[in-house]
Amino acid sequence: MVTQVAEWFEANRQKMAYALCWALTPLFYVACFPPYEVNEAAFVFLVPFAVWLSFSPSFRSVFWTSFGIGWLAWTVLIFWLHHVTWAGMIALAGIVGAHFALWAVGTAWLFSRARGEGLWKGVAPSLGAAALWVIVEHLRTHIFTGFPWLPLSASQVDEPIVLQSASIFGSWIVSFALVLLNFGIAAYLIRLVGYARTRKRGVCPEFYLALSFIVAISFMLLRLSSGQQREHAFQAAVIQPNIPQNQKWDLAFERKILEQLEWLTLPRKSPNLDAVFWPETVLPYPINDDGPMQAWATRLATGVGAPIFAGAMGIEGEEGALEWYNSVFQVRPEYGLFPLYYSKQHLVPFGEYIPLRSFWPWMEKVVPINGDILPGKKPQLLPLNLENTSLRVGSLICFEDVFPSLARESVKEGASFLFVATNSAWYGKSGAAAQHKAHSVLRAIETRRPVLRVGNDGWTGWIDEYGSVRNSLDPWIQSTTVFKISRDRRWVGKETFYVKHGDWFVWTCWLLFGLCLWIAPIFVDKKTAT
């Protein structure tokens, strides 16, 4: 009986590997991200896929299998988008699934060049697979206006020690390391079975390389993150008004919204208060083109005794040729509206504008956008004047914190900290807010700047330069508090290697992938290669 079972397993190994690939890879991939946050799942989510790949399936099979797995996993991850659009959710999941398929086929090609039984045959393909994952993630940041939501590195936001090297390499390094570890573990499991009765059973260069790499990037900056020299920066009152999305643009609720902002803001008056922060587009009118709205906001800033950083629509131009912007303004006590303001640079396609509107006018009937919002042109910093110094606020609006380059540009301009004004009310009580917050953790570490996030509901809190959440409000309720923001004085006025040099590691991965393609056949045992 035992012999028959063993023979059945031997005869059906590839089918079992294929079944486990479908069952476990999407399950572990989804589980490693917020809101589930089983971050350890990121260490093994590709193991079933890598084991199945060892059976040399056809490229066609690899493409359709990985596309289906990617589509399934991403449908679950962005299911919250159905609150806005079912069709958009399904289509977007398919697009990201296609990126996963692109990576899978490229990886299969790498391994096809290293067939045989050489001890080192899997090293180059494993490195190449990790490099290709970074390349595809980077492409996802730019193709079709970009959707870099949940890079693999975002799975580790609850383990900041793993992320610290992002200040040098960008968060790409963590994605690289996790994919390399997955293939190292898979190689070790395959070797345990394939070399069960030989001395080579415990010898697995891929696994040792991956483990060494993980340890290196985790501990290379441990001393820096543990030797912090924190100093008080400023006190910020944060307002989370929890305005239902169906009320935000309904003029019948205008007075109610303004009254909410008043009674949430005014009680925060204190001699030690330095600033008040409101979420994205919280005001019902464009503040820079509305005299009564400006007067109201100025009275409120004067009443609380601190400048208010307010998310609101901005408007420029003359009647009949108005230009609309999604902006962050500063309203000062007594003085009123500060003339400079930040406008969102990376807009949401089909949410804030219709791409190539003139080519498909029928799209206006599908997407109810009367006019396009225009993008801002630069990372306009706003001053925060304190008693003995002045800070510079780098603003990011909505999902702009998912784009590493926007945070980098603000810090290169001299931002002392990053302010993310957002609104997750579109997506209901879902995992969207927790997923969104994960990107702010990555931006904080990459730039070594504190990140203050203020949402209409969702997640409001602040994150230090090392990715640790220092304080936060409960989500999906109306709330307000005062955060005492501190900073590590060692990074004041300084730029990280990543801020200075950008995505240099991505270009290194392009070189590494090409190199691995070239050397993959070299370590194959020519006597056993097929």
Region roles according to the model:
Residues L224-H501:
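Soluble catalytic domains of enzymes that build or remodel membrane lipids, polysaccharides, and related
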Residues V2-L224, K429, R443, G455-Y466, ...:
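Membrane-embedded alpha-helical bundles of multi-pass enzymes
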